[in-house]
């Protein structure tokens, strides 16, 4: 018995020392939850709590367009609110819509992720103008920029220029001491890591092929136990064996030698409701985390059931304390 206890203690200490103590288990979801709009495709979804209200920033475009490609020309970013982190959320306003064609984001805005940096709210997103195309293709060039506000309700001041000049998507931001770390991917789903002293830039690329083994997208980055973690979509199943499931990778130095976390799967395509019915999502993407007082409390994903799309927050059974 003594030897068994010692062995168990060694295993627990070893697991904690290497940081392998993060598990994403979820509670059942209320039927009346999330953020939906009857006439729009809703995608992405990033939540921040301000006082007693939860503010969700999401992308939308009219259902008269196509899914998913319709966002490339018609997406805009909106804000919705709820007293509950799982919703249902109510539409409040358009935050980032069309503007003068001289700007980098005049045509489209997508992939919002909201953060509080100092005394400002900073909304990172991708955008495109009306005339700049990617490599002579039919697709407009997408680039990362930001908007700032002193109040979560605005007014929002948009950056005059993008912070990443090349094709860039799926921005994920980590405030790491005095540094800002930015994860993004290009059109081929090659993953980049960049760093800056200020969220406005300039950004220096510190890793230009973070996960060369396969294609990843839709990132969220955080730190725990002095290790850097990324939650993302396994686009072709090269990490976990399942196409488009959510997976977890990490790095000790936060720059290189990224590895699979154990457990590697964060979520699959099934959402279980409180009435025990199961939604088998056609697509479940764009994972974002809700962090309150240094603890991960919910995951937010965009879901598609074959007809409608919406943002679906799901509560964790056990919160995850991060640093």
Model-identified regions with their sequence ranges:
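Acyl-donor-binding surface of acyltransferase catalytic domains
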Residues: 16
């Amino acid at each position: 018995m003594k030897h068994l206890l010692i062995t168990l203690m060694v295993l627990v200490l070893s697991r904690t020392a290497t940081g392998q103590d993060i598990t994403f288990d979820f509670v059942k979801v209320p039927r009346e939850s999330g953020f939906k709009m009857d006439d729009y495709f809703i995608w992405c979804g990033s939540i921040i709590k301000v006082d007693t209200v939860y503010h969700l920033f999401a992308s939308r475009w009219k259902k008269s367009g196509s899914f998913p490609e319709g966002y490339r020309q018609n997406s805009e970013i909106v804000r919705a609110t709820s007293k509950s982190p799982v919703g249902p959320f109510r539409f409040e306003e358009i935050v980032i819509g069309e503007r003068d064609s001289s700007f980098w984001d005049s045509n489209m805005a997508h992939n919002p992720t909201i953060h509080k940096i100092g005394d400002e709210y900073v909304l990172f997103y991708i955008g495109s103008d009306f005339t700049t195309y990617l490599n002579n293709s039919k697709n407009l060039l997408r680039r990362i920029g930001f908007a700032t506000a002193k109040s979560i309700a605005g007014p929002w001041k948009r950056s005059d220029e993008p912070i990443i000049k090349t094709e860039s998507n799926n921005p994920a931001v980590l405030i790491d001491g005095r540094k800002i770390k930015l994860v993004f991917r290009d059109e081929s789903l090659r993953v980049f890591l960049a760093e800056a002293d200020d969220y406005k830039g300039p950004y220096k690329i510190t890793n230009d092929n973070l996960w060369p083994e396969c294609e990843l997208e839709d990132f969220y980055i955080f730190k725990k136990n002095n290790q850097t973690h990324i939650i993302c979509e396994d686009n072709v199943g090269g990490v976990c064996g399942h196409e488009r499931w959510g997976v977890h990778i990490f790095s000790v130095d936060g720059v290189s030698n990224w590895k699979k976390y154990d457990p590697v799967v964060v979520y699959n395509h099934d959402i279980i409701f409180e009435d025990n019915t199961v939604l088998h999502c056609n697509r479940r993407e764009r994972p974002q985390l809700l962090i309150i007082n240094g603890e991960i409390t919910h995951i937010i994903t965009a879901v598609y059931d074959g007809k409608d799309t919406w943002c679906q927050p799901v509560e964790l059974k056990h919160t995850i304390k991060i640093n």
